């Protein structure tokens, strides 16, 4: 689901209900001819959903660790669970074993200008977003004709083209330099504990002088850390 900066708790709850309904319906599509029947049985038994938030880092409440943010997340997780149980009864299927998550959702984030997806801050106030296009796609020639900046793909120069678009982050958006590595990790932990029934995914930007503290944090929360990767800040 796409989170907008202006969304109230009621707005987000409505989006959670809609996404959960769609997920429960999708979980009924378990006719998988040609593969191991155990796979279909597992899908029918667990009916895992993936109700995820995209645009969190642009939201004034959810982009920061606070008591208010925790209250919102706990409430929204309960909304998702209640909705899944009610909708599963209507369809006559098992209630999902896990519903809520937080994944990068890069394509959705770009299509809706909802940041960089997942729990990641925007890279900077201005940055260049690149897209890879097949040269056989009519859209490729169209974008070339209208003057979109482009260059041959380094890996496949004869068959692919890379297009570049300049992006400006909205006012008030959180940038990578606005958060320390520990602040990013604590934000991830808040979503892990109070929203996600699956594990949230995140890549943490780490400055040279932060690695020791990050290592200590990861050791302290060893039993909870999963789906976390790290990149040098620069």
For the regions a language model picked out, list residue spans one by one.
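Extended amphipathic alpha-helical segments enriched in small hydrophobics
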Residues: 46-63, 221
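Short capping micro-motif at the N-terminus of alpha-helices
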Residues: 97, 110-111
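Catalytic alpha/beta core of large soluble enzyme barrels
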Residues: 1-35, 39, 45, 104, ...
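A short, ordered amphipathic alpha-helix with a cationic face
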Residues: 45-47, 73-74
């Amino acid at each position: 689901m796409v989170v907008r900066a202006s969304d109230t708790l009621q707005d987000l709850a409505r989006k959670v209900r809609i996404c959960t309904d769609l997920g429960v319906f999708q979980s009924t599509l378990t006719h998988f001819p040609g593969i191991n029947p155990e796979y279909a049985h597992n899908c029918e038994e667990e009916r895992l959903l993936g109700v995820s938030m995209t645009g969190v880092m642009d939201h004034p409440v959810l982009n920061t660790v606070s008591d208010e943010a925790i209250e919102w997340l706990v409430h929204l997780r309960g909304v998702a669970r209640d909705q899944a149980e009610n909708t599963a009864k209507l369809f006559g299927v098992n209630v999902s074993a896990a519903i809520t998550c937080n994944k990068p959702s890069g394509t959705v984030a770009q299509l809706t200008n909802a940041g960089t997806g997942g729990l990641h801050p925007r890279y900077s106030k201005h940055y260049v977003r690149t897209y890879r296009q097949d040269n056989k796609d009519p859209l490729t020639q169209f974008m070339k004709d209208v003057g979109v900046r482009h260059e041959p793909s380094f890996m496949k120069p004869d068959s692919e083209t890379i297009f570049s678009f300049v992006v400006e982050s909205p006012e008030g958006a959180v940038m990578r330099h606005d958060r320390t590595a520990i602040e990013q990790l604590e934000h991830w932990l808040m979503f892990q504990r109070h929203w996600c029934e699956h594990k949230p995914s995140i890549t943490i930007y780490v400055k040279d002088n932060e690695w020791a503290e990050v290592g200590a944090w990861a050791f302290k929360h060893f039993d909870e850390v999963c789906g976390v990767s790290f990149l040098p800040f620069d």
